[in-house]
């Protein structure tokens, strides 16, 4: 999984580099704005179904067919929410035909990504995330190849967005075939009563994810209205880099959520073990990530083109927001496994309101930097309260590895300060220095990195046969 995820991020990095170079800050701003709109389409077509079905399949794998079949029917029904949302924006933005077509193309990507995520819920519930990662990697290869070809050939931002939509359709065909072949071993009927129960049970998750994603992307929407596409491009380049880093806690939460859901009521020691190990390694990742970004932010942003020089300081602020998000995302998995999603929902609502108010105050004065400040303020609120709640239920974190991380980070920082070589050599050597020192001092234990199942039989897919 780690190798596949690394491959995905390399492909995404290459595409962002080519798109930023060829489209410029204005075209790149349109591209990223359309991508943000696709997230809202995806969320309105999901409403928490993926999270809920993942949890329920992990508890009772013999219900996979019923949950998937009725979940799929419910997602088709939910098109009545996502399509009008897209239509309203397209009507409002008629004055900018290029942006309108880009949003429409990414809207297709959002709809089919929602269906792909439903298939991923089955994979996760059966702890077979290798299927998800393989199909996602294939999709990224298609997107990167087609997107680069369109951009290099001068087809523009709309063609680039169409590459995303086309690749998501191909991925859906593959995912649906895999789910039917590997996990659906009986016929299931579509029942209104089951769909209604799924909708009601998943709604709290859905509202949480909608508010979370509005909170994460409202700054882009407000920048687009209060400034211009070039400033949106400066901000979203830094934000895109932060999203890449933010996949680390998402992967950890996704991988551990099914196991936490099963263990939360009958094996509290296993839950605490996952909590301690996950927190330890997130802390050891966040320390060098923030420090390295402070030194290299300008060089990283200028790598994507001279137009993106203003993105450097944005990245320096957002990396702190990303750092606290590492822990908030990881903690949210424990809270949802404990049916505390309503508490998370209220917290996200409060943070969203704070973020909107801060953006209204800061963007007119500081533009892209104001949006970054608002993001850091609201993410800090979420981190503080999530940490307080988790510490009450699972105890204080184990900080014994912290001094080793600080020492290793300090040595790495001295290296970055003194040596001004090529960017990627500096990054690679900094990682080697940090990781090597941690390993030598005993901060990293290879036996801890994989959180292994205590029951090998749990890893085997349920075939429905005795």
What label would you give each PLM region?
Residues 414-466:
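Membrane-proximal transmembrane or re-entrant/amphipathic helices at the cytosolic face
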Residues 56-59, 112-135, 316-350:
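Membrane-interface junctions at transmembrane-helix termini in multi-pass inner-membrane proteins
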Residues 26, 90-106, 229, 276, ...:
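Interfacial segments at transmembrane-helix termini and the short loops linking adjacent helices
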Residues 100, 104-107, 134-181, 197, ...:
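Hydrophobic alpha-helical transmembrane segments
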Residues 1-50, 83, 109, 140-144, ...:
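Signature of the first transmembrane helix
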Residues 130, 157-158, 173-216, 255, ...:
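Interhelical loop/hinge segments that connect adjacent transmembrane helices in multipass membrane
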Residues 1-8, 34, 43-90, 101-102, ...:
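Membrane-water interface segments that mark the loop-to-transmembrane alpha-helix transition
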Residues 17, 45-61, 124-125, 238, ...:
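Helix-loop junctions and terminal segments of transmembrane helices
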